[in-house]
Amino acid sequence: MEQVVIVDAIRTPMGRSKGGAFRNVRAEDLSAHLMRSLLARNPALEAAALDDIYWGCVQQTLEQGFNIARNAALLAEVPHSVPAVTVNRLCGSSMQALHDAARMIMTGDAQACLVGGVEHMGHVPMSHGVDFHPGLSRNVAKAAGMMGLTAEMLARMHGISREMQDAFAARSHARAWAATQSGAFKNEIIPTGGHDADGVLKQFNYDEVIRPETTVEALATLRPAFDPVSGTVTAGTSSALSDGAAAMLVMSESRARDLGLKPRACVRSMAVVGCDPSIMGYGPVPASKLALKKAGLSASDIGVFEMNEAFAAQILPCIKDLGLMEQIDEKINLNGGAIALGHPLGCSGARISTTLLNLMERKDVQFGLATMCIGLGQGIATVFERV
């Protein structure tokens, strides 16, 4: 079986969805920009030698519809002979895109793929066109379709207080801002064209979603966003709304070596699981455990974790049940997470994996794990190993 390696990984800055940097930039353009950038950064690989493009996107309508993967590839002037497919596993879409490409390479059906994802939540809102079948309520609580209420449920089940949530959210912003100031994101962010507040076209090379002024005291003043009577989850402890894309160059180890491209890491194992939709945010726990089992590892073997921060009330129970509460500041989301950077749905799996690879190199650790919860009750995880 072929060894699957990550040769390169990049992302756009994360733009605010409401009047942000990418308010006049389409999702296809964000995607095409990264496709072109990956190929330009790795000239030893001819674009025509790509076997496929796997691109995650959740709201596949309007500008994100009609196979955005192919549309973006055409905009990027990837040769017409290279196919492309859009992948949808809701929040896990671009990580699923990685898994799909990895399996193609493992079986010998592909040697080189572009992988990534995008979501422009300013242009195509998360709830646009949603129409759940009324019969679902016979088997699943109606609130399972309301992500904020699933986070409230997890908080109550696991004893996650409002104070714990506020502290974690403040940490996310502080860590993300520190990473920005120190240049920790420089190796992953590709400057991307957008418009500033005055409408002037400029290149953005930083995440505009981060709020460095965030404090626990300020967060404590916010009202519950989803359960106004007894809730603890606020807008400040939820992932921000943002627009962005992320991309990876994934190859067989043999092809990378033949081309003189240095692999950054290999895919050690992959897992996806289902869980109760009413606590959809718990999915990373069984997914991570299964991925670790497949890799022959334990949580203690992992040097760095990237766990998508859908809500502070969601990620804290996952950290707790993976036995990592005492290691948060040493291993978990060291550059902040989606509470500060936002969670562009189809982008996030590739985004957290990209950040993870850079952290693994900076911290000089052998193993890293990226995982995320998925709406309606799923979890997805990937174990990476440096090579």
From Swiss-Prot:
Keywords: Acyltransferase, Cytoplasm, Fatty acid metabolism, Lipid degradation, Lipid metabolism, Transferase. Pfam families: Thiolase_C, Thiolase_N. Coiled coil: none annotated. Gene3D superfamilies: 3.40.47.10. One of its GO terms (molecular function) is acetyl-CoA C-acyltransferase activity. Its EC number is 2.3.1.16. The active site is at C91 (acyl-thioester intermediate), H343 (proton acceptor), C373 (proton acceptor). InterPro entries: FadA (IPR012805), Thiolase (IPR002155), Thiolase-like (IPR016039), Thiolase-like_sf_Thiolase (IPR050215), Thiolase_acyl_enz_int_AS (IPR020615), Thiolase_AS (IPR020610), Thiolase_C (IPR020617), Thiolase_CS (IPR020613). It is found in: Cytoplasm. GO terms for biological process: fatty acid beta-oxidation; phenylacetate catabolic process. The keyword Lipid metabolism applies. It catalyses: an acyl-CoA + acetyl-CoA = a 3-oxoacyl-CoA + CoA. Catalyzes the final step of fatty acid oxidation in which acetyl-CoA is released and the CoA ester of a fatty acid two carbons shorter is formed. Involved in the aerobic and anaerobic degradation of long-chain fatty acids. Belongs to the thiolase-like superfamily. Thiolase family. PANTHER family: 3-KETOACYL-COA THIOLASE FADA, 3-KETOACYL-COA THIOLASE, PEROXISOMAL. Heterotetramer of two alpha chains (FadB) and two beta chains (FadA). This is 3-ketoacyl-CoA thiolase.
